[in-house]
Amino acid sequence: MNWSVEWKAFLYVLAAFLGVYYLPVGQPRFDGAVTEALQLVRWYAREHVLLCLVPAFFIAGAISIFVSQASVMKYLGAGARKVTAYGVASVSGGILAVCSCTVLPLFAGIYRMGAGLGPATAFLYAGPAINVLAIILTARILGLQLGIARAVGAVVFSIVIGLLMHFFFRREEEERAAIQAQMPAGPEGRPLWQTVVYFAAMVLLLVFATWGKPEHVAGFWAAVYGMKWWLAGAAALALGLILVRWYGMKWYQLGLLLTVGINFGYAWGAQATFALLTLGLALALWKAGGELREWLDASWGFAKQIMPLLLAGVLVAGLMLGRPGHEGLIPSEWVARMVGGNGLGANFVAAISGAFMYFATLPEVPILQGLLGAGMGQGPALALL
């Protein structure tokens, strides 16, 4: 045995043993935190994986297969004008109702297609913060001032962070740009308007399938919520027709999917039907072969890479801070006590605390409403957003 090599493995095993040996099992705080972690990851799996992440993986896979690399390089590539690249990247998330987890596969998709690290990072940072629903809800509940500050701050800081990432990894980006410059231009793809319509159908399906229930039972948002599955179904039908007309899917495959959706929609409920239709679509893409099977393979690749990391992150967030309104290892009153006022310390604590919290898109607004009512300052609230 070579201890000069094996000592690290021994320390890892020893640390794991001591950690398990001294686990504070039976302590109310620890047991509650473990329960919160499991509750949060279960809620996440039920509320976000099927209706939110699965469509996002399909969109990311479609980006890597159907979006022309020349188009990505033109607007977001390392050789694009910085004003254009960062401008497009920082505001393009405005039309997507995505949370910080859903944006990850989209970020991976555009980066793999040749987008520069800086613009891709700007999109990753700004996307969850500036979608239209989040900005409108923030302005309505937390005030117009915070709504505008959130939108402007997300765009500005995304550009700053993107520029910093480009600076820190400039050598790698220069090498990547040199390799891309030597690559031959790809073949001409479909007309741009067809690609736009195709992605619009998928984005609308994602938006309507994840449309949350508003607080008020009347008004535009409530009306959309009442029709969400009809609207999502219309977007899914449009997507199916597009796949048949432009992408080579067979008519009988679309007919089978429609039959399943109509026959099982009322009996099984929306989510079960959505899951069954997703499996049916995956099977149809696999049977079709060609670029449709490549789309399925790319989507599965993103899911396999990202899902374990996301679930692990949600578990850690639940263990440390618990669900909203519940306790984790870190007492919530500590957070509330440390972020009162608008001082530098409160803003710093809010920013650090936010890094360990998981919020889906929109639920963070009522949570912050409660914190603001408890004395949280406007500055820390914006930092937490």
Please state what every model-predicted region is.
Residues Q69, R81-K82, G93-A149, G318-L385:
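Membrane-interfacial helix-loop connectors
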Residues M1-V13, P187-V196, M227, Y247-W251:
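N-terminal membrane topogenic signal
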Residues V34-A80, M307-V314, M320-V339:
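Helix-loop-helix hairpins and the membrane-proximal interhelical loops
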Residues L76, L204, A209-T361:
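Transmembrane helical segments that form the transport core of multi-pass membrane transport proteins
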Residues V41, A45-C52, F58, A80-I95, ...:
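Small-residue-enriched transmembrane helix starts and helix-helix packing motifs
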Residues A15-P28, L205-T210:
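Alpha-helical transmembrane segments of multi-pass membrane proteins
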Residues M1-V5, A139, G143-Q194:
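Juxtamembrane and boundary regions of transmembrane helices in multi-pass small-molecule transporters
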Residues H48-P55, A154-V156, A223-G233, Q271-L277, ...:
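Structural signature of hydrophobic alpha-helical transmembrane segments
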